[in-house]
């Protein structure tokens, strides 16, 4: 029933010995072909080759071994199909700047799963809003932007600069993300980002007037040439509150003025009034025992050790199953 099919269980299993992992996985016909190269290397005692291949996966995952993270990523408090008409949800997750590399991987896992679940027909209107996009990796984001509009999913991304996105997502994927979005709002940016935005906004035919004055006469010439609608120099010197951007329209909702350079006025008094009406997030789980003691850490630690013990027991049961099966017993190497 999926009770043990959690990410923490997978991490614990991956950190078992090769003598446990390979026979167990190979014993399942649907996994046998995937494990074949590893089994060949293991049976031929090519341990160094195996260690190099598997360490690249084990080391990043091992950094995620944490009682707190194990607590969050086990059990089934809710499903991730946030736009399910039967059970709609608002899901908010945040990264920790001090442990960005660790939690970013966990958030990326959740995000990738959410993308697959929400991008379907016959679902509620929904939105995926990501601030500081480069701090987490979201697999399939480019495809979500390209296809989600037809499934009533709005995608809103916030980041400081295109160079950040290139650094963390790579040149190709970041280029696809930037070129696929239909609406762009930008404040002050410099260098390559300002130049890219200026090119995106296009050029317009502008008149230029030149006046030449000498002792005998004054001459005026008027000519036209294509110039940037919003020059990069202007984008790089925008003041606070000033934005440039471009918006997309629909067949039945035409927008004549798609490019803008204007001030977005924020009603600070209204914001304060709204902030004053905020309510506290309700307490979902109470860790206080009957004597009034806070047992949060004890319960989190107990969950951590429970997962480790469950994986040990699963491995032991699977090894016994393989030994008892004449067709599989050859997978267990004699020590």
Predicted features, each with a name:
Residues 1-153, 168, 236-239, 247-254, ...:
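P-loop NTPase motor domains
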Residues 91, 156, 183-185:
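Hydrophobic/aromatic beta-strand patches that form the interior of the parallel beta-sheet core
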Residues 134, 162-163:
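Acidic, glycine-rich active-site loops and adjacent beta-strand->loop/helix elements
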Residues 143, 166-313:
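P-loop NTPase motor core of the ASCE superfamily
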Residues 154-160:
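Structural recognition of the conserved hydrophobic beta-strand(s) that form the central parallel beta-sheet
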